[in-house]
Swiss-Prot record:
Family, similarity comment: Belongs to the UPF0246 family.
HAMAP family: UPF0246 (MF_00652)
NCBIfam families: PRK02101.1-3
Protein name stated in the entry: UPF0246 protein FTN_1542
Protein source organism: Francisella tularensis subsp. novicida (strain U112)
Length: 254
């Protein structure tokens, strides 16, 4: 069983004290091609491309131009699971997971990324900003199409080493479309979270994002390897709701 989640635009590069064996990014050649493409963009072009403020565009420009795709170590990079710090990662709280759970996560959790493609928890990453939905073409393909074959092939290699071939999709649509479902050698299982608002159940972005992190943590801490145990998730008031679920979707409501 493998979980996939989205990355986060917010990243924390404060150093941490750990004794983990960090790993290198999977798709180094592709990263070089992408970062070299991004380095050709001036501040004003980044502002338009990413639809961000001039100040933020300057920060992104600086990040990409200081990016060294041939060097990943503690001087310029940090393990991905401790770096991303958006809503999903607030739910995950990776810095409070014990060493054995982080080591388990290394083989069961992957983060999708516009720049890195697939990221394992202990892969070292440098500061960047490139959302999967960014309107940029690489080799004549939009970003998620550029990554699709590469990511899916790598996932299939990982699933060949997994006993239970199930992909738990806790990523957003923007990122999960970078996986080719038809070519995936595993069952695809979506998970959704809904809130009861005035008698109607709705998916509310900020709550759903944090819940994805909570679910990721639950699966990792409990070493869950089957769907029936996922249904037992009962955290932050969420419970499995069969009325909104089917064989390809588990929905949790509160």
């Amino acid at each position: 069983m493998i979980i996939v989640i989205s990355p986060a635009k917010s990243q924390n590069f404060e150093p941490i004290k750990t004794d983990y064996q960090f790993t290198q990014p999977i798709f180094k050649q592709q990263i070089i091609k992408l970062i070299n493409t991004l380095k050709h963009y001036e501040v004003e072009e980044i502002e338009k491309l990413m639809k961000i403020s001039p100040k933020l565009a300057e920060e992104v420009f600086a990040k990409h131009n200081s990016f060294n795709p041939n060097k990943y170590d503690n001087s310029n990079a940090k393990a991905a699971i401790f770096t991303f710090s958006g809503d999903v990662y607030k739910g995950l709280e990776a810095d409070t997971l014990d060493n054995k759970t982080i080591e388990y996560a290394q083989n069961h959790l992957l983060m999708l990324s516009g720049l890195y493609g697939l990221v394992r928890p202990l892969d070292l990453i440098q500061a960047y900003r490139l959302e999967m939905g960014t309107n940029i073409k690489i080799d004549g393909k939009i970003l998620h199409k550029y990554w699709q074959d590469k990511i899916t092939t790598q996932l299939n290699e990982y699933f060949s080493q997994q006993q239970n071939k199930i992909l738990i999709n806790l990523a957003s649509n923007e990122y999960s479309q970078a996986i080719d479902k038809k070519s995936l050698a595993a069952k695809w299982l979506d998970i959704d979270f809904k809130e009861n608002k005035a008698g109607a159940y709705k998916t509310i972005g900020i709550h759903a994002k944090k819940a994805r992190g909570l679910m990721t943590r639950y699966i990792l801490e409990n070493r869950i390897e089957n769907v029936s145990d996922i249904k037992k998730f009962n955290v932050a008031g969420y419970q499995f709701n069969p009325d909104f679920s089917d064989e390809n979707l588990l929905c949790f409501t509160r």
